[in-house]
Amino acid sequence: MMFDTAFDLLMTHEGNYSDHKADPGGKTRFGVTEAVAREVGYRGDMRELPLDLARRIYLERYWNPVRASELPVRVRYAVFDAAVNSGVGQSAKWLQRAAGVTADGVIGPRTLAAANAANPDALLCRLLAQRLRFMADLPTWPAFGRGWARRITSLMEG
């Protein structure tokens, strides 16, 4: 899976515009928070955030920093999706723990080597188990937990 396919899949989960009162991200469009949109220079109404800008944000701020293109195909999307929901550093730490290397939150040569040497299905299971445990402990779990659990478990099927 390469970025364009991952982005298209991500859009099936992130939807269009949202301003859910329980979401600490506030206003989002295509899953991009208003804070992130402003950081990259977008000044318009969040309801009008262009899809091509969202695509660029996801490539530059999530896909590339987790070095998804260099990861085993089986875990690429899961690591990218986790970065989108919980941050690049947290996603990297889950991958590192799953691969048995020091969890420093930065995907470098050691992480890539360990991830690529691991059994991809086992690596994915360990990564997703950590993510689900983390999400279940969040105060927003009652509002969003059912959707998060479906999203995370769907990654086992792909």
Enumerate the language-model features and the residues they cover.
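Cell-wall polysaccharide-cleaving catalytic domain and substrate-binding groove, primarily
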Residues: 1-158
